């Protein structure tokens, strides 16, 4: 469904910035649609996309390096409003005839900015303010027609503009929270300079997506692999709103879900939303498949391959199915090589939602979330009426508990881990809920982003009552993160850790010890396998 971007949108040219996705999200937070495109896009290709404004991202390179990313000079002559950040300011300067050089010392972190003269970018902001810098190079001479609009002690040209041509730029990063007036600057650019309207709202999005799905599907039938995760659940609710019983969801229960999950899927989709749902009980099939398998990647491969076999077995029993809906989201597209921009961006990792169609079987794809970031998917789910405990649930890997059991997967180990994990989630859910009540922020500084139990393939000696025990330990993993790229272990209160440990040892048969994994990512990964 990626062909239908809004008429007015911002194209973010990505020069390799660590904040590239953040820029796009900040624009969307202001109710304007934005899309990331590769920096080597040509002016002709950009003209075909037809954006209403451009943002040039930062990047790690020096503009004079041999392999430094460049911009097609004609892009700056298209007559579009342009806002460049950091490297974006530098590339704008050198492309238009200015110069960039090394500063005497780099500028990293908070910096004291002083405005110089009037600028529409700085409307409504203080004469002096704190901004976030991350650079060694800086513009030393502005192009013809440009004026300097702000400076710092280290960077005399901290912002510049050619207002007549709607070209604006800053050496600092307006998109990060540490720039105290960054949101105001973005707002000034979008609404005062570009004249955007706030059309990127959930109500508008739902109305638009429902109409798109109806137009594409017509009288056809759609099938969806429903996992109970956030993405597939939101797709199910959205597609069902559009076409009702023309949608059939297939829920493959591989026996490695968390406690209560199959029941929750049944409750929400069969009873609350009245979605046609096929619940495939494949627990025994998977138990036989995984017997004796210990290598993590083999577990993943077997589970994934078998999932699609089971799914397509069910799909082929249904008559008239033409479409397959799935929960591809925008970061998937970016990480798989910027599919929507001609595949020019480097591939970071293979797309996790690629479908292995059996020979002779093919469905047209419907991907209604492929323009959305994860936080937008959650907001969409709430607007569609999905319960918040489903929408705001933490990430859960497709192979399920199988990759949180170190070694082979057995019914006994699954039972132990499922019960221990339920206690971990219950206790930390309550802790996060308390933080939300106190702060009103689901992502407050101390909230836990992901948390679960791991069952290692060892036993340990213990004492329970007057008797020696030889039972399994459980490892608690709880991390703080925003994007899973990096993570730190959560500094949970001792009282909470004590309660979790006591409950697991007391309530879960076969466990006599609880350990807490305090390793950040990197060097560790969040999951153990």
Q: For the regions a protein language model found, what residue spans apply to each?
A:
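Extended catalytic-interface subdomain
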Residues: 326-328, 334
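Catalytic metal-binding/acid-base residues of hydrolase active sites
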Residues: 175, 329-330
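Conserved helicase ATPase motor motifs in RecA-like P-loop NTPase domains
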Residues: 82-88
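RNA-binding accessory domains that recognize and position tRNA/RNA substrates
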Residues: 1-53, 60-66, 70-71, 76-78, ...
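Short glycine-/small-residue-rich Rossmann-like dinucleotide-binding loops
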Residues: 57-60, 329
């Amino acid at each position: 469904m990626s062909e239908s971007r809004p008429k007015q949108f911002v194209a973010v040219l990505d020069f390799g910035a660590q904040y590239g996705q953040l820029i796009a999200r900040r624009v969307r937070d202001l109710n304007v649609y934005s899309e990331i495109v590769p920096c080597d896009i040509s002016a002709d290709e950009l003209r075909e996309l037809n954006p209403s404004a451009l943002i040039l991202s930062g990047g790690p390179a020096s503009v004079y390096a041999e392999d430094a990313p460049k911009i097609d000079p004609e892009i700056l002559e298209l007559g579009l409003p342009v806002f460049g950040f950091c490297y974006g300011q530098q590339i704008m300067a050198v492309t238009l005839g200015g110069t960039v050089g090394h500063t005497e010392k780099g500028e990293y972190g908070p910096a004291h900015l002083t405005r110089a003269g009037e600028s529409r970018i700085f409307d409504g902001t203080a004469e002096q303010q704190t901004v976030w810098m991350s650079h060694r190079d800086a513009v030393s001479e502005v192009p013809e027609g440009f004026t300097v609009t702000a400076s710092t002690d280290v960077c005399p040209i901290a912002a510049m503009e050619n207002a007549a041509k709607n070209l604006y730029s800053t050496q600092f990063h307006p998109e990060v929270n540490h720039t105290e007036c960054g949101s105001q600057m973005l707002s000034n650019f979008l609404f005062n300079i570009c004249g955007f309207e706030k059309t990127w709202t959930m109500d508008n999005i739902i109305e638009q997506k429902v109409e798109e799905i109806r137009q594409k599907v017509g009288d056809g039938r759609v099938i969806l692999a429903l996992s109970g995760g956030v993405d597939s659940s939101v797709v199910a609710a959205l597609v069902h709103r559009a076409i009702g019983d023309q949608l059939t969801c297939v829920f493959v229960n591989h026996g490695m879900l968390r406690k209560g999950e199959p029941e929750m899927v049944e409750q929400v989709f069969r009873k609350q939303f009245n979605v046609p749902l096929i619940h495939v009980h494949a627990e025994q099939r998977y138990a036989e498949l995984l017997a004796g398998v210990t290598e993590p990647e083999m577990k993943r491969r077997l589970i994934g391959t078998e999932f699609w076999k089971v799914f397509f077995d069910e799909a082929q029993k249904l008559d008239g199915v033409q479409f397959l809906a799935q929960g591809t989201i925008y970061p998937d597209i970016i990480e798989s090589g910027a599919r929507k921009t001609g595949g020019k961006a480097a591939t970071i990792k293979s797309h996790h939602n690629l479908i292995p169609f059996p020979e002779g079987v093919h469905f047209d794809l419907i991907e209604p979330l492929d323009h959305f970031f994860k936080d937008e998917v959650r907001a969409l789910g709430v607007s569609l009426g999905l319960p918040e405990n489903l929408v705001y649930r933490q990430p859960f890997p497709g192979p399920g508990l199988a990759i949180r059991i170190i070694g082979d997967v057995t019914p006994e180990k699954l039972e132990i881990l499922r019960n221990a994990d339920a206690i971990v989630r219950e206790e930390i859910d309550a802790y996060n809920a308390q933080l939300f009540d106190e702060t009103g922020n689901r992502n407050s500084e101390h909230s836990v982003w992901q948390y679960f139990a791991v069952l290692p393939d060892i036993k340990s000696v213990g004492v329970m009552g007057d008797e020696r025990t030889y039972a399994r330990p459980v490892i608690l993993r709880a991390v703080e993160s925003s994007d899973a790229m990096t993570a730190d272990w959560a500094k949970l209160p001792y009282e909470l850790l004590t309660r979790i440990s006591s409950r697991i040892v007391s309530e879960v048969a076969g466990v006599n010890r609880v350990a807490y994994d305090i390793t950040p990512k990197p060097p560790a990964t969040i999951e153990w396998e």
